Amino acid sequence: MSSTAARPASEGRDDESARVEALIDRARAAMREIAAADQARIDEIVTALAWSLYKPENARRLAELSVEDTGIGNVADKIVKNQRKTFGTLRDLMRARTVGVIENDNGSGIIKYGKPVGVVGAITPSTNPAATPVNKTMMALKGANAIIIAPSPAGWSSTNATVELMRAALEKVAAPIDLVQILPHPVSRNMTRLLMEQVDLVVATGSQNNVRAAYSSGTPAIGVGAGNVPVIIDSNADLNDAAEKILASKTFDNSTSCSSENSLVILDDVYEDAIAALKRVGAYRCNGEEIDLIRERLWVEGHLNRELIAKDADVFAAGVGLEPTAAEARFFLVEEEFDAGSPFADEKLSLVLTVYRARDFDHAVELVKRILDVQGRGHSCGIHTRNLDHPIRLAEEIDVVRVLVNQAHTFGNGGSFNNGLNFTLSMGCGTWGGNSISENLNYRHFINTTHLVTTVAEDKPSEEELFGTYFARYGKD
């Protein structure tokens, strides 16, 4: 047989298996080298990783490469994302203990020790081929773990460049470079499956197919749910402030974020004023014919058209066939009555923002529920309002992990310097979204905890204390 002859499929699979096993062996060897590292040493390593992406020339280079590779998003915003998410995550991590004693007694008689979860397999998306790998790697290595990244095939080149920078950063601080590795090109589904089956923890960000595969791998897994964020503009909202925040959030990186607004629910008594405020900041109000054009071209055979998603507004307008003036817009408003069967009720990954009119706040809440039932349940919703009772009602009634109040959703949902959420690029959506976590992915998900338990003064209440109210009402029979 000549050297150019095709190999049997089984031979290719065996080769992939051997390559994955070799990566895992190197990862475990690297972990052994830092097994005795104290918190200061771990923090030094994490800081080096952060600088590898935060460094201005690196943030720009990887942003340019990401857009070149994937055709998704825009360079200026990816630079911001690369730096902001990395800086915010570093802030969070530098304030946490993860190795050795991480919590001491507090009167409970329990001392907690942080320990690694092991080798982490990280599934990363094409939407963030630099920021997400670094974000997950920082969290994983904060727990003294090693990580192997399985990138989206479309983003492999930029993710590989990111990994090379991280490995160089590790070498600079004399840490084992195999703490961070990447699946070799070309990444196949089989290779990713083998990785998920052999690591100690899988963390999957990206398509729901990837998330389901992670949960089906037989390995402990953390996945994230689908986005499709609905945001209410309330009757007493500051309309100009809301419009500015929606503009900043919706247009950031051309709506690649799962936290980008996908629908607005505007109260009837401020509907036209809110539309006017949105138009002042650059929204384009599509007419019926234009809405039909978008419906026909944004989806191809039921799937989002990759030629139009996450594109600049002028590219989108030309691709859809909108009026020439639409090319000057920042984003596009599509107004319609709610229809669960309409594609506009789904996540659109584009500068298209669906707008619904609500009769009153009760109707607005109902619409948010119905939108999330189509897609995005568990993820998040938002509201612009001066009535603090309304966001409380959303928190009580809507099955989401996050309800954001008067915020640019893309910037607040994954952590911000002016809210209490930790920085992340992976949003857990609870069981509502088919996930194992109902919070932002964070360093705590990358450590095991040993509890050293000593005795304390007995804390045993009487039967009367625990059953008294029940006995008084129902007796002891």
Language-model-detected regions and their locations in the chain:
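Flexible, glycine/charged-enriched surface loops at secondary-structure junctions
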Residues: 36-41, 63, 174-179, 252-258, ...
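Short, surface-exposed amphipathic charged segments that create phosphate/polyanion-binding patches used
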Residues: 195-198, 238, 298-306, 417-424
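Short, flexible turn/loop "capping" segments at secondary-structure junctions
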Residues: 23-25, 223-225, 253-258, 342-349, ...
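Conserved C-terminal structural/oligomerization subdomain of aldehyde/semialdehyde dehydrogenase
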Residues: 4-7, 35, 322-323, 327-477
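ALDH superfamily catalytic-core signature
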Residues: 6-8, 14, 134, 142, ...
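Structural signal for hydrophobic packing residues in well-ordered secondary-structure cores
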Residues: 24-31, 35-38, 46-57, 66, ...
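N-terminal Rossmann-like NAD(P)+-binding subdomain of aldehyde/semialdehyde dehydrogenases
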Residues: 2-111, 139, 280
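Rossmann-like NAD(P) dinucleotide-binding subdomain of oxidoreductase/dehydrogenase enzymes
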Residues: 98-241
